[in-house]
Amino acid sequence: MIDGPIKVFLMPHSHDDVGWLKTVDDYFYGADQSTQWAGVQYTIDTVVSELANDPTYKFSIVETAFLYRWWNNANQTQRDLIKRHVKSGQIEFINAGWCMSDEANPYYEDIIDQMTIGFRWIKDTFGVVPTIGWHIDPFGHQATNAALFSQFGFNAWFFARIDQQDKSVRMANKGLEMIWHPTQYSGIDNYIFTHVNYYHYSPPPGFCFDNNCRDEPIRDDPTLDNYNLVAKSEKLVEYFKNQSLHYRSSNLFHTLGEDFHYANARMWYKNVDKLLNYINARPELNVTINYATPGEYLKAINQESNVYPTKYDDFFPYSDCDHCYWTGYFTSRTSLKGFIRDMGRYVTSVRTHLGLLKVAGSSDYIKANTKETEEALWEAEMALGILQHHDAVAGTAKQKVTNNYILTGCKALAILNKHYNEVRKEQIKNDISETVATINLGTIWNGTAADWGISAVLATNKSVLVNLYNPGPKGTYTIRLKVEEQELNIISSAGTTVAGDLICSNTQDTKDCDVLFNLAFEETSTSYVKLVPVKSGGSAKITKLKSITITESTRDFNLSSTASLKYTRSLQKFDLTTSNGNLSFTVGYNYYESYQSDGQKSGAYIFRPANDTILTPKKYSDIKTVHYAEGEVNTIIVLEGDKTYTRMYFSKLAKYVDQNGFEMETLISPINISDRIGKEIVLNLATTLQNNKTFYTDSNGLEEQKRVVDYRPTWPLVQFEPASGNYYPVNSHISIIDVNTKQRVSVLVDRSQGGTVLRDGSLEIMIQRRTTMDDSRGVGEPLDENGISQKVRHFVVIGDGNRAVQKANDQRIITCWANTASATFAKHPAPKPALPVQDTVKLYLRPFADDSYLLRLMNFDTSKSVNRQLIADYRQHPCWLDHH
């Protein structure tokens, strides 16, 4: 126990999920109260009013998405009052992103963006900059978040959920506060003071005074038989003295609130006032308690000279009981995860494109519609901010809320595309002197030819203009468009014929085909081609699928001068030879049966396999037929299973970014649970590499974490779940390295998924899951998405090229198409970069209506510094860069 007096910093707060059991709108307005009693507008109303009654009252506000709505509905008196509380220090904004984002699933770009819009609005509205991170509810914590929070300028961050075994050790060693110094391969020295809450993010047990709490109120009239002030005060003092056994400071921090509390703030402050007045008037108790904010607590402990332990790794995976690993949500609602990731990369690219056009003064549409264009970006950014919430991208909200999340994103995209399409039409006219009435976005990469609609135009013997914007680095890329089978010429804007393939690799829909061709791009540039229907001899070579029979021993494919492929049918084994080395591998699809007996069930949060499949998942999809097509641009292998349909694309371009690997596209049929057994589907890439139980996963797509099976760096692990206890979030890639040859193999993902390497050489990624039971973590329903077929993409890379593939995947070509009256180009523009940026640098440019810009640069190659002046044009918009 701490010698001397104990000072307790009691923090009033409300944890307000930006969607979970109810939609964001319902949570704000207090609708659908039968599902959950919550109304955030009432919380802010009553807190702002109550704080005016006593200058010692404090409150911390976290989720800017709700505060923004409240502010827009508030009258001037309310606005003035909350500003007064902020200025006096009674209200502190902590975290202050648009939401409290998940940590396992968001991409680092989307984390930064949702924090940026929150920070900017808080700064513009209240003139303050948040200094405290607050992540009390995410289900595990990434090292990248610690690094980013340090770079955001946060002095500390607070959270509640760490593994039960880890917390037991830290409580015994007084290690619940630490300096987190995440290992950064970039060499950047980031560290941040980290506090783990003593009792979740709740009030002390027995001291909850909210509308929905059942604890006794404080009765302070000694003439009453049920007078309890003294007993309750002594109980609270004893509680904090016990807490002091587990921290190094005589200053203690504790939360006072829970989910959607303080809709009646008077109940809280009136009851707690009685306790504080009684305890603080009695120095013999050796405890003083005051309302506080996290910033005040941090200031107090900074006056001391305590030494804190250092943390270098991360806090994954998280478990709260022996068989309760929260690793299912790494994959839950994979379609939602894919939508959010696609939307994030798309909005990032469109925003930068609009910024480059504006700063160059090359768009009359943007000049005339500056305010409207910025509002469209703002709508998209707010929607994306909501989607980063720890029950949104995590896939742990109710189904009706998930549907609303998707609707929110779709509405925002529709607003953005309304303006972006006009800009693209304008650019087409400026670049090639063609006027198009309607432009169509070809962003449905997982759609069919019928979804795209190009063939409906080609069928009328009319040509199609394709507008291609490259938001990324200079290079040659393979373009893939969805069409039906027919003879086509591909004409470049230079007037030359482009060689390509037209391959119908969908045996289930013979009209669903791909036209593939290679095209060279400058960085941040636009290119054009036309698809012209011809009677015969088109430049897009029609290549038919052929079958590899079970009796055929092997099939060899010559991919390029540096790469070849051999497939052994009887073993279903591939041997890929590249300039980065050779790789022998098999592809399989297995499944774990969900645990559904007594005890912890598998559900939206928890992945717990049934006992008989813990280490031996069952085969999910039998590969019945193998097809192939050898085109000019790609060789395609098709693995047709009874529940999966896989297309593997091997590039034949020697300098293509994917040359030292391949792309794999898997269509997963709806999971059948007619037997009422949940199923959790995994992709297994089995290689011959010996990785000695060690593998690597990225951290939010930014850094990399070393993982060792059945091992934790900071405590002696007792493993109760050998499968789920070794699962980790994969946002960008999972890799293994052979201990003898040092060969590296990585699998890159197109959305967040869970992954592991339970057996040497076998990379396992969970790609879909469906359960029949709830896992008792609050959502109150099983993860039962009915009838969903899902297409996912993976990129397998040999060697160290995963950064290049990741960058290309982040900055995908944005494809638009339109009807055109001519089969030729009247003008022949040479592609030129909107801005010359190094190929190791990723550019983010956000334009604002006041003619200001937010510039952010990500340097993927830390061995090279970047020092460049970006000159917009003669209108003088310099943006200076010195980032490395």
What are these regions (language model features)?
Residues 13, 118, 149, 255, ...:
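Conserved, mostly hydrophobic/aromatic
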Residues 4-7, 53-59, 87-92, 125-131, ...:
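Loop/turn elements at helix/coil->beta-strand transitions in domains of secreted/extracellular proteins
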Residues 1-5, 51, 270-289, 295-884:
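Terminal accessory/anchoring regions of large secretory-pathway or extracellular enzymes
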Residues 43-48, 81-86, 111-122, 229-246, ...:
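Structured alpha-helical segments in the cores of large, soluble enzyme domains
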Residues 17-39, 62-72, 95-112, 127-140, ...:
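The substrate-binding groove and active-site-proximal loops of carbohydrate-active enzymes
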Residues 150-254, 258, 278-290, 294-295:
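Active-site-adjacent pocket scaffolds in enzyme catalytic domains
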Residues 1-113, 122, 209, 346-352:
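N-terminal catalytic cores of secreted or lumenal carbohydrate-active enzymes
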Residues 109-144, 151, 238-253:
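CE4/NodB-like, metal-dependent polysaccharide N-deacetylase domain
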